[in-house]
């Protein structure tokens, strides 16, 4: 169960991490992972330490994850690998798909430096600067969904991604008004085109502005700005309840008070039972099982926890992680790993000393996921969508690269099992956790080790253990989380 918990609430565990967690009772493990606010946030100070996952900078350039997108991707992969708050990064990844926002469109308008800051700026990197979108997902990802939704409505990256800066009272732009209902809260079938038009008018005037040294791309950033003159001050009527008394109309109010329209509307969305069940279902599929139909009783329990605790996401997670369904062995390996999850799990289980996060960037993209670059506002195609011929080839190539890089460390760790191919295969299958291999597959692995006379000598162990690792980590079975 421990390994299952570490895979689902984080990104699996290295052998050393697994040993440390094994010393704790299961309930303590879950509590520590869930209530991660008590854990250190010093993960970034380890960047550049040769004992951790490496990073690769542009030739002659310092590591600049707040202004260079490839460096930002490497930093996020580093955090997924080494953060003492793995659930924080896991939830950021979950919400990144939910509030799917792509870097390239934004960079085309403001340049790569400012676009990178919009996506994942660490505000400590530049005095007074705004947290990037992914940093906001870390900050608010397990708190009130109302707060999170309002933060996304005001987020500069989201504003440009869905053209909210063009949304004015004389020419309403419907993109955000539609997506906040269809994708971010209620779901399809729970709103009408009348609601879309009214929602667009709610957010008129939500815009952005540049702050800092405007002439310096490395010393400036974008932040939210409300433009009252662009706001539609008239009443907005919906087909569903906006207020607890059942009222469906946001009243007319002076444009200077127009942000209250958005607050009223967002509170209506988050308190709607359709939103509660939709978020509950998405969390269930992400943490429990996306292959079988969701358990209706647990979905109801999660939705009730949300509605009964001021729309708090952690309240849902607490119920979910305590549930029999989460711990049921029938739900182990019943999720398709997202490429980011697959890569980090492999790095943790195979090894990372001397390996660069940069070496995972192209393989991850070839597997179908480039961080900060979902294909569209719908996010990535999940589940079986991750399994394709090109994705399989990318996983096999990545597994070969990683295993080859770690061959000396792999051989050192496996030295106690070198007596026979059978023992080595047994060890490897227990270290690199999967849903299991058939007897035929296991025999094929043993035959691979015996392809030349087995001696267990150092050179042979290095070559064969790397090859065996490649076979397991590159196999389809390893994709399941």
Residue ranges and their predicted role:
Residues 1-4, 21:
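Extreme N-terminal leader/anchor segments
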């Amino acid at each position: 169960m421990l390994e299952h918990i570490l895979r689902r609430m984080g990104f699996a565990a290295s052998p050393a991490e697994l040993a440390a967690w094994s010393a704790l009772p299961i309930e303590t493990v879950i509590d520590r992972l869930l209530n991660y606010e008590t854990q250190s946030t010093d993960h970034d100070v380890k960047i550049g330490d040769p004992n951790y996952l490496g990073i690769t900078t542009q030739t002659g350039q310092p590591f600049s994850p707040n202004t260079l997108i490839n460096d930002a991707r490497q930093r996020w992969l580093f955090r997924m690998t080494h953060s003492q708050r793995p659930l924080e990064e896991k939830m950021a990844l979950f919400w990144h798909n939910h509030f799917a926002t792509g870097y390239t469109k934004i960079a085309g308008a403001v340049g790569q430096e400012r676009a990178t800051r919009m996506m994942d700026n660490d505000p400590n990197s530049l005095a007074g600067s705004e947290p990037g979108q992914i940093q906001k997902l870390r900050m608010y990802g397990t708190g009130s969904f109302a707060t999170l939704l309002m933060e996304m409505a005001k987020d500069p990256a989201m504003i440009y991604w869905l053209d909210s800066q063009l949304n004015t009272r004389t020419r309403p732009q419907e993109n955000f008004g539609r997506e906040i209902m269809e994708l971010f809260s209620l779901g399809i079938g729970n709103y009408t085109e009348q609601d879309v038009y009214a929602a667009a008018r709610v957010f008129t005037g939500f815009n952005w502005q540049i702050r800092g040294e405007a002439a310096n791309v490395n010393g400036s950033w974008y932040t939210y700005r409300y433009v009252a003159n662009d706001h539609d001050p008239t009443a907005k009527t919906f087909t569903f309840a906006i207020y607890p008394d059942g009222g469906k109309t946001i009243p007319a109010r002076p444009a200077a008070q127009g942000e209250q329209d958005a607050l009223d509307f967002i509170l209506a969305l988050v308190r709607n039972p359709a939103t509660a069940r939709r978020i509950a279902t998405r969390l269930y599929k992400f943490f429990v099982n996306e292959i079988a139909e969701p358990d209706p009783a647990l979905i109801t329990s999660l939705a009730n926890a949300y509605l009964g605790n001021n729309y708090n996401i952690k309240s849902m997670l607490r119920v979910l992680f305590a549930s029999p369904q989460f711990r049921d062995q029938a739900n182990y390996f019943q999720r398709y790993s997202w490429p980011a999850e697959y890569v980090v799990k492999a790095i943790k289980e195979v090894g990372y000393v001397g390996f660069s996060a940069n070496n995972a960037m192209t393989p991850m993209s070839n597997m179908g996921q480039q961080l900060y670059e979902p294909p569209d506002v719908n996010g990535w195609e999940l589940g079986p969508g991750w399994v394709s011929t090109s994705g399989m080839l990318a996983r096999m190539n990545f597994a070969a690269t990683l295993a080859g890089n770690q061959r000396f460390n792999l051989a050192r760790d496996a030295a106690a099992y070198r007596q026979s191919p059978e023992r080595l295969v047994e060890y490897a299958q227990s270290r690199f956790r999967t849903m299991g291999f058939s007897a035929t597959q296991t025999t094929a692995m043993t035959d691979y080790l015996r392809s030349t006379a087995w001696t267990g000598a150092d050179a042979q162990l290095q070559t064969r253990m790397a090859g065996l690792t490649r076979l397991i980590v590159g196999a389809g079975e390893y994709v399941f989380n």
